[in-house]
Amino acid sequence: MQETCGIVLAGGMGTRLMPLTTSMNKHLLPVYDEPMIFKSLASLQRMGIKDVMIVLGGHSGNSFFHLLGDGHRFGLSIRYAFQEKAGGIAEALSLTKGFVRGRNVAVILGDNLFEESMKNHLDRFETDSKFDCYLFLKKVPDPSEFGIAWLDENGSITKMLEKPDNPDSNMAITGLYFYSAEVFELIDKSLELGAYSDRGELEITDINRFFMDQGKAKGILFDCHWADCGTIDALIETSVLVKNWNKGPWLIGA
């Protein structure tokens, strides 16, 4: 069994964090005492993943190289790809196909923070012959603000809607995804069809629906704290939480 590799998606303009992101990639902003990118890298590191690619965008490439280098001081091997313009999560993921080379892949959005390790779920995914996609779900008080999933009694995802009105599910789809290498076949097919949304992006939701329609998407409902640090309020609130948890450095070697 090949080891799983990791992808951190760290592009985007960070418009919800303006003016902080006018001259800085949002993933370099601090979450309490560490850059945001340290938190997402730590999620991969905690799962035992050592081979990582970071997909960048915008104008802060040199800052990432200076901060992280090739990853050796963190016990990681870090490589980089560059998304020239905003084209969506699935398009960004397509840039990593040559790096992944047929392996399973754990993908995390660089502004997402997970309090606990998901290693037990990765161990299960690596031996799972039924599902090629794990999506991580968290119950939220206001489902209308998120992409929402529905599960059957076996944990299979049966339905997904983006920011639905008054849904009878409150399970938000977070920014952590496990995929088999089949994800690149689906992305390639979408690229060939030019299946971009009205906002000009190749949507990861459409790729996840392909897995769902084949009965290959599983929902993982987890209990630990999750934060999307994409707004100023969320950045402040999460920084206070991390301070109160008092766990020290998240990224080993930092």
What are these regions (language model features)?
Residues 1-8, 16, 29-30, 34-108, ...:
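Conserved N-terminal catalytic core of the sugar/cofactor nucleotidyltransferase
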Residues 22-27:
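Short alpha-helical oligomerization interface
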Residues 28, 149-151, 219:
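A structural signal for short hydrophobic beta-strand segments in well-ordered beta-sheet cores
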Residues 69-75, 150-151, 210-212:
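Short, conserved catalytic or adaptor-binding loops enriched in Gly and charged residues
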Residues 81-83, 136, 220-222:
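Conserved beta-strand termini and adjacent loop/short-helix elements that scaffold enzyme active sites
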Residues 116-145:
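Conserved donor-nucleotide/metal-binding helix-loop-beta segment in metal-dependent transferases, i.e.
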Residues 126, 156-253:
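Catalytic-core segments of class I nucleotidyltransferases/pyrophosphorylases
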Residues 133, 142-167:
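Anionic-ligand binding region
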